[in-house]
From Swiss-Prot:
Entry keyword Glycoprotein: yes
Name the record gives this protein: Class I hydrophobin 1
GO CC terms, sorted: extracellular region; fungal-type cell wall
Disulfide bonds: 53-108, 60-102, 61-94, 109-122
SMART domains: HYDRO
Amino acid sequence: MLSLLSKAVSLAILVTAVVASPAGNGVEWSGGGTTTVTVTASSPTTTVTQSQCSTGDQKCCQSVQNSSAAGVSSLLGLLGIVLSGTDVPVGLTCLPIVGGACQSQAVCCTDNSYGNLISLGCSPLQL
């Protein structure tokens, strides 16, 4: 149990470091077991409206960065996620939008299956 708690705390610290340092620090992580994910996303500059967000999960993310950013790619590797595309917008520390308000970055993402930690294939969302 302590090991699981230790991993959770380490992962939370890594996410905080990625969000605080978009350029990354050049550290490479490798995770055990991989999951290949195919993400089809709109162009990162395309803004969608709430009615155009067909995934059903509109998120408010603390940060949205490109999957090729060093810190983001390290986090994906640590989680065992291998994206089949490059330059996929990744939302970090994302929560569901409640009451139509978001104080950070409102996005519509194609893959929200990783809890509140990350969302994949994110496009800016106009509230």
